């Protein structure tokens, strides 16, 4: 199952991306998280940062040789803050840190944009994470190719 957690790319440079996700009650994962107090699940906030980070890395010249999709390799120092309720938007900013051997070290922060709010937007989640190419054995790759044809 795939959830697209990037509605719009607001800014994109080789070192930074800013995206926006509008959260609505139409999102199927909100139906039971939680029934009487719907909020965006924390793992979906992290996934929004991962999807933004993936777009950032894939837009760079030094990622042109990728043979496999980028996947989440590691999460560090993840901190959650404010709940994200339907009607609000999640503004995600991801910055590229070091490019390691076959890995990209990223730092992300997602803030809550509530309708009519003034002042600084509260942080929903922040942390560091690593994206790397998926590691698939040759047997799995053959099976994957047979299934997708």
Regions found by a protein language model. Give the residues of each.
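Catalytic strand-loop segment that frames the active site of acyl-thioester-processing enzymes
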Residues: 1-40
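Hydrophobic core residues within well-ordered beta-strands of beta-rich domains
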Residues: 3-5, 90-91, 104
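Conserved positions in beta-strands of structured domains
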Residues: 6-10, 76, 81, 95-97, ...
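HotDog/MaoC-like acyl-thioester-processing domains
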Residues: 14-16, 85-87, 95-149
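Short, hydrophobic/aromatic-enriched beta-strand segments in well-ordered soluble domains
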Residues: 21, 93-96
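Compact, glycine-rich, soluble single-domain proteins
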Residues: 31-58, 69-72
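Hydrophobic beta-strand-centered segment that forms part of the acyl-chain substrate-binding groove
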Residues: 52-91, 128-131
